[in-house]
Curated annotation (Swiss-Prot):
UniProt superkingdom: Eukaryota
Entry GO CC: cytoplasm; cytosol; nucleus
Membrane-spanning parts: none
One GO BP: negative regulation of inclusion body assembly
Name by which UniProt lists this protein: DnaJ homolog subfamily B member 8
Molecular function terms, GO-annotated: Hsp70 protein binding; protein folding chaperone; protein-folding chaperone binding; unfolded protein binding
Domains as described in the record: The antiaggregation activity resides in the serine-rich region and the C-terminus.
Organism name: Homo sapiens
InterPro entries per the UniProt record, alphabetical: DnaJ_domain, DnaJ_domain_CS, DNJB2/6-like, J_dom_sf
Entry annotated with the keyword Chaperone: yes
């Protein structure tokens, strides 16, 4: 039986945050919907990753697992009350999909609903959870995460009207991640309508800024590609 720490790729001394980050990364990688050409293997790995997270993310279950090991845990089981050992009765793991959606704030991160949720997280816990999950899940895009944070700041600023929209396309028939995100922010600055659009696809970030419908600047991975000088 696989070692749950090895399944998540973490040390036995891993912190709860390390466990969460590992789960985000592996669950997104092996979700069956992201692996249509390798669904059977993906389902097995996704289930195992879910099992590992379910045990190691719970301090009591993790402590018992550390003492008994994976084989004993699976053979024994979970407690019906907090006063019994989880090895008293047969343990049934939760549905991997339920854990996955719960982890991402009750939403499917591959759906439009996830991306259309409010991003002004400072006013509510749910948005903050999405931002945290998103940050760790796509930590390989630092420029994108910086952009994501700036969107939160815009949403909480006063004296401007800001709207957000975003789209995600999951799945890939090739070896690439197939991840694409489009986020746009519109606000009024000194009487001018300024729209900032950020597009992240295949590890590259493109930022377009329009003022009153006119394209003003374009940057790719932080490097300026186009800039219109105001002739006024």
């Amino acid at each position: 039986m696989a070692n749950y720490y090895e399944v998540l790729g973490v040390q036995a001394s891993a912190s709860p945050e390390d466990i969460k980050k590992a789960y985000r990364k592996l669950a997104l990688r092996w979700h069956p919907d992201k692996n249509p050409d390798n669904k059977e293997e993906a389902e097995k790995k996704f289930k195992l990753v879910s099992e590992a997270y379910e045990v190691l993310s719970d301090s009591k279950k993790r402590s018992l697992y550390d003492r008994a090991g994976c084989d004993s845990w699976r053979a024994g089981g979970g407690a019906s009350t907090p006063y019994h050992s989880p090895f008293d009765t047969g343990y049934t793991f939760r549905n991997p999909e339920d854990i996955f959606r719960e982890f991402f704030g009750g939403l499917d991160p591959f759906s439009f609903e996830f991306w259309d949720s409010p991003f002004n997280s400072d006013r509510g816990g749910r948005g903050h959870g999405l931002r945290g999950a998103f940050s760790a899940g796509f930590g390989e895009f630092p420029a994108f995460m910086e952009a994501f944070s700036s969107f939160n700041m815009l949403g909480c600023s006063g004296g401007s009207h800001t709207t957000f929209s975003s789209t995600s396309f999951g799945g890939s028939s090739s070896g690439s991640s197939g991840f694409k995100s489009v986020m746009s922010s519109t606000e009024m600055i000194n009487g001018h309508k300024v729209t900032t659009k950020r597009i992240v696809e295949n590890g590259q970030e493109r930022v377009e800024v329009e003022e009153d419908g006119q394209l003003k600047s374009v940057t790719v991975n932080g490097k300026e590609q186009l800039k219109w000088m105001d002739s006024k």
